[in-house]
């Protein structure tokens, strides 16, 4: 089997010199992470990469993931025991206020929920639900930057593909992009929703980063072309020392 390297392009690598060097080193697919890319920049980034290399582009969806929104500074410190408002609508966060995406996702939060931000760097314990916001107490102190992955300690409803993902995939299709990745693929139905957009003639990578994804893998496999194991996000639900065993299960499935 020939080894294929998937490389993520970001601010420090999105230039012609770096992309060409990465191409020379054998990169087989360049990933554009939509979680950290503005929709209005997608077309320009694809055009640049296509002008620098013949290696294909892969658009990686935001998917069913909660993230905190913009913070007033590069990072904001939340003091243990401090009261914090979790707003339903998007706001600029500070040491006493924070909001999450997708928009209005906080409406699903309830009293007693724990919301963890940036791999448990900070943990908010929700104490009271109001009409436009929730009150929470900082249970675990720490720094929070903008757009950090977050999770809650119970199942909530999340669309497997966001409106931004849909629009970005459509842009990609018009520009000849043939590789797409679905973050947080939890079921075959999730993958089918992407197939409705990109069709079966294009390549779909399913990212397995949750227990649900592992449990439903046999149903997911017939819908997708490849599997990508996201060990970082998977470690939110699986003890890190057990990740290699889960990887083995996925590989041999």
Predicted segment positions?
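Non-catalytic helical/linker scaffolds that mediate oligomerization, partner binding
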Residues: 1-253
């Amino acid at each position: 089997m020939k080894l294929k390297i998937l490389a993520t392009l970001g601010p420090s690598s999105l230039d012609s010199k770096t992309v060409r060097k990465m191409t020379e080193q054998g990169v087989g697919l360049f990933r554009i992470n939509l979680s950290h890319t503005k929709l209005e920049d997608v077309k320009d980034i694809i055009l640049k990469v296509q002008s620098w290399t013949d290696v294909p582009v892969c658009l990686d969806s935001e998917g069913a993931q909660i993230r905190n929104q913009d913070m007033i500074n590069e990072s904001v410190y939340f003091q243990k025991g401090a009261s914090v408002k979790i707003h339903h609508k998007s706001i600029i966060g500070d040491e006493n206020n924070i909001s999450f995406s997708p928009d209005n996702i906080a409406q699903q939060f309830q009293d007693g929920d724990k919301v963890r931000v940036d791999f448990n760097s900070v943990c908010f314990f929700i104490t009271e639900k109001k009409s436009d916001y929730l009150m929470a107490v900082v249970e675990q102190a720490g720094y929070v930057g903008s757009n950090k992955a977050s999770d809650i300690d119970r199942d909530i409803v999340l669309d497997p593909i966001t409106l931004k993902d849909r629009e970005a995939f459509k842009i990609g299709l018009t520009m000849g992009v043939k590789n797409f990745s679905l973050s947080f693929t939890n079921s075959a139905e999730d993958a089918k929703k992407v197939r409705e957009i990109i069709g079966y003639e294009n390549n779909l990578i399913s990212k397995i980063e949750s227990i649900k994804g592992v449990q439903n893998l046999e149903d997911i496999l017939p819908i997708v072309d490849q599997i990508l194991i996201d060990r970082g996000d998977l470690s939110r639900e699986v003890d890190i020392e057990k990740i290699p065993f889960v990887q083995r299960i996925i590989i041999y499935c």
